[in-house]
Amino acid sequence: MGPRALLVLLVATAWHAQGVPVIQPSGPELVVEPGTTVTLRCVGNGSVEWDGPISPHWNLDLDPPSSILTTNNATFQNTGTYHCTEPGNPQGGNATIHLYVKDPARPWKVLAQEVTVLEGQDALLPCLLTDPALEAGVSLVRVRGRPVLRQTNYSFSPWHGFTIHKAKFIENHVYQCSARVDGRTVTSMGIWLKVQKDISGPATLTLEPAELVRIQGEAAQIVCSASNIDVNFDVSLRHGDTKLTISQQSDFHDNRYQKVLTLNLDHVSFQDAGNYSCTATNAWGNHSASMVFRVVESAYLNLTSEQSLLQEVTVGEKVDLQVKVEAYPGLESFNWTYLGPFSDYQDKLDFVTIKDTYRYTSTLSLPRLKRSEAGRYSFLARNAGGQNALTFELTLRYPPEVRVTMTLINGSDTLLCEASGYPQPSVTWVQCRSHTDRCDESAGLVLEDSHSEVLSQVPFHEVIVHSLLAIGTLEHNRTYECRAFNSVGNSSQTFWPISIGAHTQLPDELLFTPVLLTCMSIMALLLLLLLLLLYKYKQKPKYQVRWKIIESYEGNSYTFIDPTQLPYNEKWEFPRNNLQFGKTLGAGAFGKVVEATAFGLGKEDAVLKVAVKMLKSTAHADEKEALMSELKIMSHLGQHENIVNLLGACTHGGPVLVITEYCCYGDLLNFLRRQAEAMLGPSLSVGQDPEAGAGYKNIHLEKKYVRRDSDFSSQGVDTYVEMRPVSTSSSNDSFSEEDLGKEDGRPLELRDLLHFSSQVAQGMAFLASKNCIHRDVAARNVLLTSGRVAKIGDFGLARDIMNDSNYIVKGNARLPVKWMAPESIFDCVYTVQSDVWSYGILLWEIFSLGLNPYPGILVNSKFYKLVKDGYQMAQPAFAPKNIYSIMQACWALEPTRRPTFQQICSLLQKQAQEDRRVPNYTNLPSSSSSSSSSSSSCRTGSGGGSSSEPEEESSSEHLACCEQGDIAQPLLQPNNYQFC
């Protein structure tokens, strides 16, 4: 047996073992040099076939069960993938081998120079590498060496070429395959990639105008425009069956190709009238639109109505009178007019007119019709061709009215019944025994007057009829009733004949029986109770918006804008479904503030932590209106870095929600007190619950604390309502002491206090520039966010002012008296200057590290006298002299002598610059120095500053203040309430 036969036998044996054709030489790839003889043998169980780049240079030798491909001079053109299949094998299967003919002069074999795909499909650029060793240095470039677009996503296979994945229309270019050969770049011939738009529908088509009317001789224009995502589409304009030859304008706009046909007619004639159709054709199909062009001899104005011109409507109902107008040229004027007959009806008629090219529809609405609105209503229209009118006659139907009188006719007693109404009423008489206001169904019919005398029948007025009933001799204890009715309703009136001899009177003692007296007493008691409850309700404080916006002023007389009249911009509306609520940050008498996560606020993928204000479910309508007013004021003011800014709102589909910035470090007052406790120690700091975190919540707890009015410890009931998280457990706080450790752990420096003061002043200057008065400037209403940035807010909603002794009852409101200017306390005058006074109190809070203003002084008549006489608090322990001078300027009794917030900002900026130049002011005093400062402050007394009282009396008061520091007593006394 020869070697060749043995080889065939071995290959056949291997194929039977595998069940698929086998190619020799084995292996997925074969690399040869140019000019080499290449032999590919495929062996199967039956006849086999070759598939691949088989050119005439290949010789095919069939030797079943094998097939042999041979070429004596291999070139780079023979590079490619060759497949061997066995058609007769039911199991299918094929064998594959890839042939490389590595030609250094031709590293690429390009199978096609043009590739067309739909947008979004993968595009294969068939440039095959002839040498697998060059794969590391291949790349894809655009023609003339330009790089591919940055967004082009492609991959490379040496067997197949480059594949651009999900080709885009913008990637329509000529590409070249590039390889590094012996240090130089060799590119293939160009391959034009054509990316076509996926035509999923017809071209967009517009034919304007939709309807056209012209007078003979006028000019006209018809525009047919079409747009398509691909340039391969046509557009045509036809008049009837005739295709018009019109020059076409092309453009590319908004990623669409546009083609426009414009027909201009300078002098139209009747031959130009008719149907015009515009057709656009693309790969998907045709799309057509048509219009009608009418040519008329002259202008016209036609008025019609689908309603009857004679209208009858029941009084109290609504009617709409509608007129349809066809006019060319368009209407110059039109109006509805009431033509009478009731001259006292002068109300402005409410009508709506809708225009549609050459047609108008005007509708006059008459709601809840009154009798005086009956009459003629005329619609009058005018255009260049003249004028025309259409008149409706409106008659009102209403039930009868009856009046019965008695008269003598021919010496006989006669009852006269006058009935008026529309339509004409019919009259019947009945009588019943005894005196009664109305006869029942058992009453006997006396007369059915079907021929009542018509006294008056005027158009648009009621019809008045008379009916007479002769009763002869009067009978005592009998009632006569006249009944009138029409299609709308009925009415009646009774008449009692009075007999002089039959008159009787009840005894006086029967008028006030014990039962009657008891009922009257109970009614009086209930009335008193109702009045008492009403008084208590009126005295109950209501949730009000503290912020006010000035509309105008004259002297000290201010006119404020009604916030309910401010517009609400729907741009603030935010889907309530995109809010994920967390814990309650604060809860007060009227509502609460809840932590929430807002999804898509500002940007679609944004996730932002926010604070959401909402009312309690038991809120009254005026409180809901107040929250809506607060929302309108915040949106009216706009944004500023140093106010708690509005982020959005939910006003539809549920309770009103106001979305504001979330300030993670809570209010400034608690922040200062935490810092004071950390710096000075518990014995010298203000009271603070160790479990209380920084937040918004009002918690009223009875606990041990350090007295805030001085620097001495005491025990009692803490009545300051702090803003803290709902849960006092540190494990449940999202912002616990551990979370705030980094921020709180940084030592509090003088520059921090100056920054707080300056930031609040900048926020107040912004509010003043917007003519806005805050009316509750205090450290508790200032929040701190990351970076120790102070933001002004108003948290009356989430503060339990019912139990906060800082708010004193005056009238039916609770007011922060210790922070209020004299003119606000005594004259109820609130201005920007009164906010400046409150800002001075806020400065005192900041530089005393959170002490309560006017320490040791109760809010009573003596306190009011001190304020009126110009009493000022002493310089705080940590305030530089210049800062205390600003406080004193803010506390000037004459409002006009107080500085503006802009001036305060300048003064604080100057002080901050001095602080940077003087190192001694960088850090606040230590515990020892603070202690001495506190003692010094006590010796100086709370009465530092100007006072009109004698010095001796003031000194005794200061000494008494210091003596009180040694006595354990509540921080704020329970009798801090003053009624206006």
Curated annotation (Swiss-Prot):
Annotated positions of the Phosphotyrosine modification: Y543, Y558, Y696, Y705, Y720, Y807, Y921, Y977
Residues annotated to bind ATP: L585, G586, A587, G588, A589, F590, G591, K592, V593, K613
Residues exposed to the Extracellular side: 20-514
Pfam families the UniProt entry points to: ig, Ig_PDGFR_d4, PK_Tyr_Ser-Thr
Location in the cell: Cell membrane
Cysteine disulfide partners in this protein: C42-C84, C127-C177, C224-C278, C417-C482
Cleaved signal peptide residues: 1-19
Region feature (Activation loop): 794-816
Transmembrane segments: 515-535
Catalysed reactions, as listed in the record: L-tyrosyl-[protein] + ATP = O-phospho-L-tyrosyl-[protein] + ADP + H(+)
Cytoplasmic compartment spans: 536-980
Cellular component, GO, one term: plasma membrane
Record's comment on post-translational modification: Autophosphorylated in response to CSF1 or IL34 binding. Phosphorylation at Tyr-558 is important for normal down-regulation of signaling by ubiquitination, internalization and degradation. Phosphorylation at Tyr-558 and Tyr-807 is important for interaction with SRC family members, including FYN, YES1 and SRC, and for subsequent activation of these protein kinases. Phosphorylation at Tyr-696 and Tyr-921 is important for interaction with GRB2. Phosphorylation at Tyr-720 is important for interaction with PIK3R1. Phosphorylation at Tyr-720 and Tyr-807 is important for interaction with PLCG2.
Modified residues (Phosphoserine): S710
Residue ranges of domain Ig-like C2-type in the record: 21-100, 107-197, 202-297, 299-397, 400-499
Glycosylation sites: N45, N73, N94, N153, N275, N286, N302, N335, N410, N477, N490
GO molecular function: ATP binding; cytokine binding; growth factor binding; macrophage colony-stimulating factor receptor activity
The family this protein is said to belong to: Belongs to the protein kinase superfamily. Tyr protein kinase family. CSF-1/PDGF receptor subfamily.
Function according to Swiss-Prot or TrEMBL: Tyrosine-protein kinase that acts as a cell-surface receptor for CSF1 and IL34 and plays an essential role in the regulation of survival, proliferation and differentiation of hematopoietic precursor cells, especially mononuclear phagocytes, such as macrophages and monocytes. Promotes the release of pro-inflammatory chemokines in response to IL34 and CSF1, and thereby plays an important role in innate immunity and in inflammatory processes.
Full protein name: Macrophage colony-stimulating factor 1 receptor
Organism the protein comes from: Felis catus
